[in-house]
Amino acid sequence: MIRVLLAEDQAMVRGALSALLNLESDIEVLGSAPDGEAAWRDIQKHKPDVLVTDIEMPGLTGLELAQRIQRHELPIKVIIVTTFARPGFLRRALDAGVGGYLLKDAPAENLAEALRTVHRGGRAIDPQLALEAWSEADPLNDRERQVLRLAGEGQSASDIATQLNLSHGTVRNYLSEAIGKLGTANRIEAYRLARQKGWL
């Protein structure tokens, strides 16, 4: 029996996933969480074999949950089910140890089969997304990504410098590097492009 925990912030999707998986004779849904923090508590309580999670949720994101599971060396496999068909998200998910990455518009039977594959130690990745992920690498380094994310959220260079304990000039350099690497005219365009690609 594969013991599964669901993490999904949309109640209707959460209910549909639970109902779908409960139809399978070899899968048991232990519970479902509406956000990342609740999912982390449920992980510690239920100790599932597999976590099926959305990527964007309040509290902790699905990626942050996967990273936390990896950091704590928990024997839990992770499958992300999302609407985000962005190669950058897939690359970050794989870096976080995720075993499966499926799009919500995939056929329903794909989820149960992916669960079995990932539970056995395999990978279940949307094939088209995998091709795109390998063809276009994220040009930003961690610090450029961090500074660009904060700038895109509306923070000034001075605010970012204070928050990250950097000089104002260093923040401006990181922003200039990110803008140059992405081939955009300004930080807003750079932020939008990086979000669109899934690099932020």
Regions found by a protein language model. Give the residues of each.
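Two-component signal transduction core modules
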Residues: 51, 78, 101-102
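Short, flexible helix-to-coil linker/hinge segments that flank and couple to helix-turn-helix
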Residues: 88-145
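Conserved acidic carboxylate
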Residues: 8-10
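Acidic, metal-coordinating helix/loop segments flanking the phosphotransfer/catalytic sites
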Residues: 32-50
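Short amphipathic alpha-helix used as the core "switch/output" element in two-component signaling
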Residues: 41, 63-75
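Recognition helix of helix-turn-helix DNA-binding domains
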Residues: 156-189
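Acidic catalytic/metal-coordinating carboxylates
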Residues: 35-38, 58-64
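Active-site residues of response regulator receiver
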Residues: 54, 82
